Amino acid sequence: MSDQKKLRLGVNIDHVATVRNARGGAYPDPLRAARIAEEAGADGITAHLREDRRHISDADIEGLMDVLSVPLNFEMAATDEMQQIALRHKPHAVCIVPEKREERTTEGGLEVAREENVLAHFIAPLREAGCRVSIFIAAEQRQIEAAHRIGAEVIELHTGAYCDAHAEGDFAQRDAELARLRDMATFAHGLGLEVHAGHGLTYDTVQPIAAFPEVIELNIGHFLIGESIFRGLEPAIAEMRRLMDAARA
């Protein structure tokens, strides 16, 4: 497979930290998981430093910056505190996500269209510092257009509605969500944006998304950490890598 065709896999290690924090202490170590993910074929590592520090910690981000040989995709809310942390560490990529303290996981995409001026000023220093700025959004044309206007280089399309419809057996809705994702990936690519996708992807749902030629990167975490309980982290990631590559071939 040529480098041009290869789809990148970003492995999100947040929920290794979730398990660690359930008991306190240092085990299991997210940094060890990140190194295993690299060995298993991950092209990058994603970590979300939430405002409430419910899983990934500041020390984890510092450690990842020190040990990784692949790029770090630093997920964060659009707050002054997170901006300062990102500017201090200067990770390869920063993905701006919506965040609510009461949610279990990121429930939807960022409302870029409603906050264009604020977000444009927020991401400017990050871009000047050399970080690639990505915006996590719903597959909606108005959000994509707004992300483009504020100067984002990358968008990440929220695949949760597609994955949820598949899990619920609503295949008509699943197919409609898949078509919407495909159309919006094509639209974003036409604007010159780099297109990523993620949220809720599993072995059963990854290949239709991986087959979109406009999508350059998938970010997958919760499923892989869960599957690692049964088959081990390296084999779980290697199987996802295999499915992605097969869909792209």
UniProtKB/Swiss-Prot annotation:
<dbReference type="Pfam" id="PF03740">
    <property type="entry name" value="PdxJ"/>
</dbReference>
<dbReference type="InterPro" id="IPR004569">
    <property type="entry name" value="PyrdxlP_synth_PdxJ"/>
</dbReference>
<feature type="binding site">
    <location>
        <begin position="14"/>
        <end position="15"/>
    </location>
    <ligand>
        <name>1-deoxy-D-xylulose 5-phosphate</name>
    </ligand>
</feature>
<keyword id="KW-0808">Transferase</keyword>
<feature type="active site" description="Proton donor">
    <location>
        <position position="199"/>
    </location>
</feature>
<dbReference type="GO" id="GO:0005829">
    <property type="term" value="C:cytosol"/>
</dbReference>
<feature type="binding site">
    <location>
        <position position="50"/>
    </location>
    <ligand>
        <name>1-deoxy-D-xylulose 5-phosphate</name>
    </ligand>
</feature>
<feature type="binding site">
    <location>
        <position position="23"/>
    </location>
    <ligand>
        <name>3-amino-2-oxopropyl phosphate</name>
    </ligand>
</feature>
<dbReference type="GO" id="GO:0033856">
    <property type="term" value="F:pyridoxine 5'-phosphate synthase activity"/>
</dbReference>
<keyword id="KW-0664">Pyridoxine biosynthesis</keyword>
<feature type="site" description="Transition state stabilizer">
    <location>
        <position position="156"/>
    </location>
</feature>
<feature type="active site" description="Proton acceptor">
    <location>
        <position position="48"/>
    </location>
</feature>
<feature type="active site" description="Proton acceptor">
    <location>
        <position position="75"/>
    </location>
</feature>
<feature type="binding site">
    <location>
        <position position="12"/>
    </location>
    <ligand>
        <name>3-amino-2-oxopropyl phosphate</name>
    </ligand>
</feature>
<keyword id="KW-0963">Cytoplasm</keyword>
<feature type="binding site">
    <location>
        <position position="200"/>
    </location>
    <ligand>
        <name>3-amino-2-oxopropyl phosphate</name>
    </ligand>
</feature>
<comment type="similarity">
    <text>Belongs to the PNP synthase family.</text>
</comment>
<comment type="function">
    <text>Catalyzes the complicated ring closure reaction between the two acyclic compounds 1-deoxy-D-xylulose-5-phosphate (DXP) and 3-amino-2-oxopropyl phosphate (1-amino-acetone-3-phosphate or AAP) to form pyridoxine 5'-phosphate (PNP) and inorganic phosphate.</text>
</comment>
<dbReference type="InterPro" id="IPR013785">
    <property type="entry name" value="Aldolase_TIM"/>
</dbReference>
<comment type="pathway">
    <text>Cofactor biosynthesis; pyridoxine 5'-phosphate biosynthesis; pyridoxine 5'-phosphate from D-erythrose 4-phosphate: step 5/5.</text>
</comment>
<feature type="binding site">
    <location>
        <position position="105"/>
    </location>
    <ligand>
        <name>1-deoxy-D-xylulose 5-phosphate</name>
    </ligand>
</feature>
<protein>
    <recommendedName>
        <fullName>Pyridoxine 5'-phosphate synthase</fullName>
        <ecNumber>2.6.99.2</ecNumber>
    </recommendedName>
</protein>
<dbReference type="GO" id="GO:0008615">
    <property type="term" value="P:pyridoxine biosynthetic process"/>
</dbReference>
<comment type="subunit">
    <text>Homooctamer; tetramer of dimers.</text>
</comment>
<feature type="binding site">
    <location>
        <position position="55"/>
    </location>
    <ligand>
        <name>1-deoxy-D-xylulose 5-phosphate</name>
    </ligand>
</feature>
<dbReference type="InterPro" id="IPR036130">
    <property type="entry name" value="Pyridoxine-5'_phos_synth"/>
</dbReference>
<feature type="binding site">
    <location>
        <begin position="221"/>
        <end position="222"/>
    </location>
    <ligand>
        <name>3-amino-2-oxopropyl phosphate</name>
    </ligand>
</feature>
